Amino acid sequence: MSSSKVKAHKVHLLIEEIPTIEQMKKSFLDLYDGWKCPSCGLEDETFDHVWTCDEHRSLLLKIKNNTIDLLLSLLIEYNPDITDYSALLMLNIWTISTDPDNFTFVDLIKGFIPLELTQILNLWIQLLLVIIEIRQYIYEQTFKEIWIRRCSFIKEFERSLGITKKKKLTLKNFRPFNNILNSDRELEYKFDALDSIRNNIYFGKNIIEFYSNLTS
Ligand SMILES: [Zn+2]
């Protein structure tokens, strides 16, 4: 991936604006109305839900544990004299949830490096080298293991419904009975496209069934 794309993705993470289903509804409500999280099929797929979805829990736990292992190995490498890591391990940043009052692992995914973490590390080592490495590890792991996987899932699902980039552009800002549509044929085409997608979602292929077929 190009460095400009990596930067764009990091900025979008920071401002919680990756293209989740809830985010897509803002531009394509007609298309995504009623859609739920592609992984569990139960909750609305908000930014926070991508990382706290039950279906991603074991993966995220693995990433979190590997992050702690990596951090400890870096600390041992840079300062073999440290013997007690309990203050570090007790930080709230290792919790996999969202919390309005405390920084959690979800905030690390966004790219935040909380002061409480840097304060502890500062006592022990040359901070910057470790922070850069840890930050990059979390970014690469959550991006590859959770976000990219989720995106290929959605892509496959959309393809099965005939939703292409071109079709999305056609449907963007579309509202029935507005004045933009001036030919009957155009109107008919747009209703057809929407109806067939809706039928697929609501009556044809059940989303959950589709997902289980895809994974089995
Ligand atoms: Zn979910």
Please provide the spans of the model-predicted regions.
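Family-specific functional microsites
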Residues: 1-216
